[in-house]
């Protein structure tokens, strides 16, 4: 029986960890958490998101801009997030409406699709 979600993983290009940290920690405000010693040599970094984590791994060889795969961050005050991201030059794409939520999406600096979603 599956009892929950432990973590999700996204990827960035090999060697792009500092750019990734800047975007995910400085711009989005997520907290970096320590990776286990056994995984530190593999590149990437981990982020705390509420009571779960997002693992940012490194991987080359594909175009992240062509995939629909994404992660959705549950937020408060969606319009504040939209304004903050636009101030950083990030293009906002309106999401297809779904009942009970407002949302939008954008691409991170590496092409990963990211969604911000708020309950209404």
Identify the function of each model-found stretch.
Residues 43-45, 69, 100-104:
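Short beta-strand micro-motifs in enzyme catalytic cores
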Residues 1-21, 69-71:
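N-terminal beta-strand motif that seeds the catalytic metal site of vicinal oxygen chelate
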Residues 1-3, 83, 87-120:
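Vicinal oxygen chelate
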Residues 29-36, 90-96:
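Short secondary-structure junctions
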Residues 64-85:
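Mid-chain, well-packed structural core segment of small domains
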Residues 31-65, 113-118:
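Conserved short beta-strand elements that form part of the metal-binding/catalytic scaffold
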Residues 24:
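Terminal peptide-recognition signature
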Residues 3-4, 63-68, 98:
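Short glycine-enriched loop/turn motifs at secondary-structure junctions
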